Amino acid sequence: MNAPAYVVGGFVRNFFLKRQSKDIDIVCVGNGIQLAENVAALLQPSPKVVTYSRYGTAMFRFNDIEFEFVGARKESYSADSRKPAVEEGTLEDDQKRRDFTMNALAFSLNPDEFGLFLDSFEGLEDLNNQIIKTPLDPGITFSDDPLRMMRAIRFAAQLGFVLDGDTKQALKKYKDRIGIISQERIAAELNKIILSPKPSVGFLLLFETGLLSIIFPEMLLLHGVEIKNGKGHKDNFFHTLQVLDNLSQVTDNLWLRWAAILHDIAKPQTKRWQADIGWSFHGHEVLGATMVYTIFKRLKLPMDFKMKYVQQLVRLHLRPISLTKENITDSAIRRLIVDAGDDLDDLMLLCKADITSKNQSKVQK
């Protein structure tokens, strides 16, 4: 073909981060589909090439690695869609359309300069400084494809990086653009945030930028403390983040982490003031289990056994704590074992993570 070709994106980023990659993106100045077919024909056994002619892309899987080929291109977007109009471009044009500078890095695959490192937007410096920054003005990057706002926060949570100041401001300014993105795509990024080493990093950024109020308003309602007659309750938003982080230290079970997020979700709706005891949230576990269904349905999360599992844990999350009281009966313990069934161990993990008190005697009990 004699078309200049380059490895770009996540593979190059992960090379410098010394992280494994499951996919390799290859950009050529020419026909990406034709290049994919030519490369596949040279491999044994020859993999099946899947093509997307509208975008000029093709991919195949070989040795458990997914290869994606695309012709270098320019993209332009309309105000109400994230589907771009595409035209042929140069390597630099293609790098400009990337979401972040750390994903705009490239290695040449051309025989006369094989392995040459190409960094048009100082992405390696940003990578070394652990900064998430866009190649273009962030307003253009996020307005063109608002899902990139979720990706920025996801990368911050996954890698422990910080958002560049202008990038963070653009997230706040263009947050409403997230409305043109499908719930499925938002949920996919949200799940990646939840599965990150310290999910609170991502949720705090969602909170600070205003995105949380749009994609997950029920969680935002947990924020705040009300004080009456000198008595206040804990901020259930920050408590939830602490529970989530606690649980994330011991499990990578996505749906158990969702149970941590939703275990107190109904506290705003069940909050009551009683002069003799102060604030109460009676029945929040029952209403919360009902809300799991509504939230999963809106976010287009699985409505199968995974949702029911989260409901079960939310409904039962107070039961183990109640067993710490004196004079508890063997029958109460047996009832919990029967009611929790196969989820008992996970329930106990959630219960332990839910203990965020600074009072060591309470923790010990």
Where are these regions (language model features)?
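Catalytic cores of the polymerase beta-like nucleotidyltransferase superfamily
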Residues: 1-365
